[in-house]
Amino acid sequence: MSNQHTLLMFNLLPVGLNISTWWNFGSMLLTCTALQTTTGFFLAIHYTANINLAFTSIVHITRDVPYGWIMQNIHATGASMFFICIYIHIARGLYYGSYLNKEVWVSGTTLLVTLMATAFFGYVLPWGQMSFWAATVITNLLTAVPYLGSTLTTWLWGGFSINDPTLTRFFALHFILPFIIISTSLIHVMLLHNEGSSNPLGTNSDIDKIPFHPYHTYKDTLMLTTLLTLLFITTSFFPNIFNDPENFSKANPLITPQHIKPEWYFLFAYGILRSIPNKLGGTMALVMSIIILLTAPFTHTSHVRSMTFRPMAQVLFWTFIATFMLITWAATKPVEPPFTTIGLSTSILYFSFFIINPLLGWSENKIMNTHN
C-alpha cells in the first residue's frame, strides 16, 4: 500500500508546464553520479593504492580484467560528461535566475566544490606523470596559506613530499566523497521541491502545472538516452580524447613534464591561478573563481528574474560564457606571450561578470521606472 502512495506522489508531482530542455540536466547529473559510483566501485576492486603498483594495476584493469577497459573508459569519459552537464546546469541557473532560490543554490555550489575535489583526487590515482605533477602543483598551493601553510601541506602529504601515504589517503578520499555527493544531492533535490523549479519566463509556475509523469519522465528519458549515446560513442571510438599523453608514462619525480596542466574541466580555474604572478593572490583567485557563484543570489538587483527579457544581460551572459571558454583554451598553452596576456584579460572579464550584472540590473530598473 505504501508503494502505491509513493508512486502516486511521484506521478502527481506538479511541475511547471513550460520548463525547457535546460531543466533536464539535473536528472542527467543524477545518472552520471550513479554511473560513476558503479564503475568506480568495480575499478576499486582491482586497483592497488601503492606508488609502485598503482600504474600497473590500471594497466592490469584495462588489459586483463574482463570488461575492465569498458569500466575504465566509462569512468574516465564519464567524469568529463559529468562536468559538461554541471557547467550547463550552472549556466542555466545563472541565465534564468534560478539562484534566487538561495538554499538550492548554496547546496549546489557545495556540490560543485565537492565534485571538483573528488575529480582532483581521482586524477591522481593512476599515478601517471601528469597525475603526479598536477598533484604536486595543486597541493603546493597550500603553502601559500600564511603561518599554517607548510604544516598543512606536510599533513596532507603524510610526509615531506608526495609519496605512498599521499596516494593512499587520496584513494580513501576519492572513495568516500561520492557518498557525500549523493547525500548532498538528496538535500539539494529536497530543498528544490520545497519551492519548485523556476521556469524560462522567471514567473511563478503555480497557476499552470502538469504531472511529472508521463510528461517530464519521457522528456528526461530522451535527454538521458542522448547523454548515454554520446558517452558510449566517445568511449568506443575516442576513448582517450580527454586524456593527457603524459599520463601514459609512469610517475617520475625526477622528470618534470614540459607543460603541467590539470584535466580540461579545471583549466578555467587553473588559467585564473596562472595569470596572477603572486602565489597567495593566485590561490585566492582560484578559490574565488568557484566561491564567487555564492554571491549571485545576494547581488541580484533586477526586478526581472530571468534574462529572457533582458537583452543587455544576455550580451553580458554570453560574453561570460565566451570568456570561460577562452580561459580554458589559454590555460592549455605554455606560459608565454600572448597567452599570459589573454589569461590575465579573460580572468578580469570572468570576475567582471559578477560585478557588472548587478549594476546592469540596477540601471534596467531605472530605465523601466522612467518609462512607467
From Swiss-Prot:
Pfam families: Cytochrom_B_C, Cytochrome_B. Heme b b566 binds at H89, H188. Heme 1 (or BL or b562) is low-potential and absorbs at about 562 nm, and heme 2 (or BH or b566) is high-potential and absorbs at about 566 nm. Its cofactor is heme b. InterPro entries: Cyt_b/b6_C (IPR005798), Cyt_b/b6_C_sf (IPR036150), Cyt_b/b6_N (IPR005797), Cytb/b6-like_sf (IPR027387), Cytochrome_b (IPR030689), Cytochrome_b_C_euk/bac (IPR048260), Cytochrome_b_N_euk/bac (IPR048259), Di-haem_cyt_TM (IPR016174). Disulfide bonds: none annotated. Binds 2 heme b groups non-covalently. It is a multi-pass membrane protein. The cytochrome bc1 complex contains 3 respiratory subunits (MT-CYB, CYC1 and UQCRFS1), 2 core proteins (UQCRC1 and UQCRC2) and probably 6 low-molecular weight proteins. Its main location: mitochondrion. GO terms for molecular function: metal ion binding; ubiquinol-cytochrome-c reductase activity. Heme b b562 binds at H75, H174. One of its GO terms (cellular component) is respiratory chain complex III. This is Cytochrome b. It comes from Heterodon simus (Southern hognose snake). Keywords: Electron transport, Heme, Iron, Membrane, Metal-binding, Mitochondrion, Mitochondrion inner membrane, Respiratory chain, Transmembrane, Transmembrane helix, Transport, Ubiquinone.
